[in-house]
Amino acid sequence: MKKTILASTLGLAALGAHAQSSVTLYGIVDTGIGYQSSSAALGSNSGGHAVVKMVQGVWAGSRFGLKGAEDLGGGTRAIFQLEEGFNSANGAQSTTNLMFSRAAYVGLANQQYGTLTMGRQYAPYYSLLAPYSPTNWLTGAYGAHPGDLDSLDTIYRINNAVVYTSPNISGFTVSGMYALGGVAGSTNAGSSWSVAANYIRGPVGLAVGFERLNNSTSGGGAWGANSTANSNGEPGVSGITNGFQTAQAQQRFAVTGGYAFNSQWDISASWSNVQYVAGAGSKFFDTQIWNTGGVVLHYKPLTALDLAAGYSYTRATRANGITSAASYRQFNLSQYYTLSKRTGLYFVEAYQRAGGQTLGTNGAGNIIDATADIGDGQNSAPSSSRSQVAGAIGIIHRF
């Protein structure tokens, strides 16, 4: 049961008014044991070894938070959320130097006019597409598309963001965001923007979204600390994108959808186009593009048991001197057993096979064989070879 503290009704005798407030403490603890057939340093094509280790946040990121609302009257509420992630294996904060790395925002919500929030939060690109992302359909963090390249598992949040989300109108919801870079002399440097829409009606759901993240380092280069899409480094760094860390901008476009056949079977699918745009200061010279398609099938044979299987295929374009474009095929399985309303056991398994070539850490001129990197890049390390097998067993508790 969530621990909800309802503030007593505030008697404002002088004004003759009453207001009701609520604050909720909530969290998730997710810890397990994981295996990788090859674990290597980012950018390395050698020295990878098998490893068995404690893992955390595989099914859902460990976190604690506070969220609340105050009734302002007339159907309007003031809302806020403060949320921090942590490593449940050792107690460390998930992001150094940030007290609330997962969310920190305040805003106003009205059932008729929608919601406006300001602060550190998700982009609409993720918020509205998430219901049909591969990791929300029971494949865990290992089910993210390679390196979470398309950010449908959202490995970052946006600072300084203003987000408007419409009310649900006949199944449709739209949302837009702009995040101010705050860089003197340039409104574009470090800024981010995103738009998205979804439609959910009965067993059918569809969503489409776009986002662009600008580097605060003019012309590209090391991802600037003032970039709104920043949390101790460039967003989205993995074995897939390592050679393109100096991009002037990142942009993503994706379409997701799902259909529930009945109470036991449902399916989701997604397609994304990701572009890392080169600038004068980048270590690569052509815009690098990746296209990814994926599908997840979910089956619930018992009330307490959920099974899922997923497949995705990612292919890069030939650019930056590469003649054999990188490709990644990933297969996923997952099993989740519900012990109670708040507690469950999970098992996840994945296999990925890479092909072609990509850029190494030094960018253009450092062409290397593409190596496998399963999942979102936070819960595993890249392989030093073309293939990688990974799996985990864990327990998750929500409060």
Predicted regions and their residues:
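Outer membrane beta-barrel
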Residues: 21-35, 52-181, 189-212, 350-354
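Short sequence motifs at beta-strands and strand-loop junctions characteristic
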Residues: 55-59, 97-98, 154-156, 187-189, ...
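Gram-negative bacterial Sec-dependent N-terminal signal peptides
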Residues: 1-20
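Detector for outer-membrane/organellar transmembrane beta-barrel domains
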Residues: 196-338, 349-351, 388
